[in-house]
Swiss-Prot record:
Belongs to the phenylalanyl-tRNA synthetase beta subunit family. Type 1 subfamily. GO terms for molecular function: ATP binding; magnesium ion binding; phenylalanine-tRNA ligase activity; tRNA binding. InterPro entries: aa-tRNA-synth_II/BPL/LPL (IPR045864), B3/B4_tRNA-bd (IPR005146), DNA-bd_dom_put_sf (IPR009061), Fdx_antiC-bd (IPR005121), Fdx_antiC-bd_sf (IPR036690), NA-bd_OB-fold (IPR012340), Phe-tRNA-ligase_IIc_bsu (IPR045060), Phe-tRNA-ligase_IIc_bsu_bact (IPR004532). This is Phenylalanine--tRNA ligase beta subunit. The keyword ATP-binding applies.
Amino acid sequence: MKFTIGWLKDHLDTQASVADIAEKLTALGLEVDAIEDPTAALAPFVVGHVIEAGPHPDADRLKLCRVDSGTDILQIVCGAPNARTGLKVALALPGAVIPATGDVLKKGKIRGIESQGMMCSTRELGLGEDHDGIIELPADTPVGVPLVDVLALDPVIDIAITPNRADALGVRGIARDLAAGGLGGVIADTLTAIPGRFPSPIGVAIDPETLASGACSHYVGRYFRGVRNGESPAWLKDRLNAIGVRPISLLVDITNYVTFDRARPLHVFDADKLTGTTITARPARQGEILRALDGRSYTLDAPVVAIADGAGPQGLGGIMGGEDTGVDENTVNVFLESALFDPANTAAAGRFLGIDSDARYRFERGVDPESCLLGAELATRMILDLCGGEASELVIAGAPPVWRRTIALRPARVARLGGVAVERAEMVAKLRALGCTVEDDGAEALRVDPPSWRVDIGAEHDLIEEVVRLHGFDLVPAVPLPRDPMPKAVLTPGQRRMITVKRTLATRGMLEAVTWSFLPRAVAKGFGGGQDALVLANPISSDLDAMRPSILPNLIAAAGRNAARGYGDLGLFEVGPRFHGGEPGQQTLVAAGLRAGKIAPRHWSRPARDADLYDIKADVLAAIEAAGAPTASLQVSADAPAWFHPGRSGQIRLGRTVLAAFGEIHPAALALLDVKGPMVGFELDLDALPLPKGRPSKTRPPLTLSPFQPVARDFAFVVEAGVAGDAVIKAARGADKALITDVVIFDVYQGDRLEAGRKSLALSVTLQPTDHTLSDEEIEAVSARIVGAVTKLTGGSLRS
């Protein structure tokens, strides 16, 4: 929110300096972002007098001028159409920096004629957007004096407004705060109601549905006839230019001025462009189209409030007017709108349309509910004074919403919540200075009625904040944080397990990724999700509209982005939630991993190979083992979800519980994400892992080593082709759990030397005695039990 010091002093009687005003604003919570002093950039400029202006000998559009700078007569080549003899101008001498461009002015030749200076336009001085001609100063302006002494430029203060302080989005609201803070007094408002000269030929109405919802609760209108919509006076243009608002025409500038002066947005229609005799605030109908004042066309729907005439929507309530009924230089009859729109509805409509405007910025924060009539009367006075014409009687629909409220303020609570002791009398004085009505009958609590413009004050704690704010945040004593000894941080078993899994995957060369918990619904459907319960009602982006049923698509997309930037060989993992329902608790914590490209960089000692099924299986088994699950009891089956390759994937179970799925990502799943493969991945359900029994201990169990030599024996079994290798391993391991410490498959054969539909699995079994060296008889006995177990449980036979 920007304002000039002169503008502020229209509302605040004070002799305070700019520095004092800025300091007080920050102390009151209206933080000053910047103080702009336009005089600093204009210091080198002086008032010049055009003694003679004649044609340039070599250019029809240029003029050759002799200009008195007060100390010298300069020859200046100028292209401005209004350059003429006798004109007083803003003169830049060589060495001056032009504010609009930052260029240093130098003497130079223009079409063969030396130019020794520059006569400047408003835009070149950074004072506005007008560049059709050079600045024309009053004829009695002294020659050679500094330009800043003539222009009487005001410093501009820019403050940051918190969302609750809608009242400070107008200069008068800022003046009220400064006065309440002890920096001067608010100048009384002398505005009086202006009687209408004739009945308004245009009426106003609020649709019952719109009125009932509160989307528009109060609409005040007024008709003006015989107005002149010309250029605004200099004082009005200067104020708007100073705060960054481009002057357009008298009528538009007046509505903009009231918006920033009183935080009261207004709108004016060209009455001759309206159809019918009634303007209605109603819900927008689906498919209606309006071309707004920003030159863009918008398709309307709820929750937009359409300001409509007999032909359809002519404005977007609380946001922006329509181009078709906008005023222009030919306008002679206008209709003024001063209405009240609901903050939440205006915010929703603005987001739906994608429009940011000064009106929306104020309405969605809350405009003074009593300001419709005030805004209409203030605009009426300015229109009649500056544009002439006659005003009709007011036409009104609806009424201000009920805003009066009485809040009990217990002075004792101020010290408790605010952290500072404030005398009761000071509280009363501060709140009354703020515009509140305060009743103090000596009871425990004060009875406080906030003013209409402070829509943010609704409870006792709001009043306490105001008391402390006006008393001074800097007077709140600093209290050191307590230094009581705190217990050491305690992690739950689940948290410890999550950290352990992360570290394990990181040590295996994977990089941790953190991705969104949502993804496109079409992608979610390809990974078992996309149900209505998992679709977001208000997504942060249209392509992130569903909660993720799996982390894998996010990792696949991340790997694809890395590959597009030249990093195709990588491993990623993420630990986070996946969602299988829309209710609380319908989510699980999972660890997901993905490998793409080569498993290791190229090296002369070994050929490079792509990451495969067995690499990712080793990753997930390492994570399961690190989490403390009984790996010896795991079973592997080939029934992974559909987004895995059916012949190169599997699931890991503990009993009937599915712990993880792993394998090569299905080409269709990669195509859904527009990513090239192959890629392998896994997803481990951490919530499904059994928690460790007993209390955790920081001490490791003793390392038990056998002093006796281990014994390895190899076996080759012929089994049906459909028998899983894991089944053979488990059968062999179960033959003697005390002696057998490891079983691995080191060879698989299917070929002509075996019957069709059968395969050979070669196993290496390690026996580790603990109390004596095994004899040949003991080894043969264990071997026989191994053969018997595999034959019984898998139907296989020892290969001869």
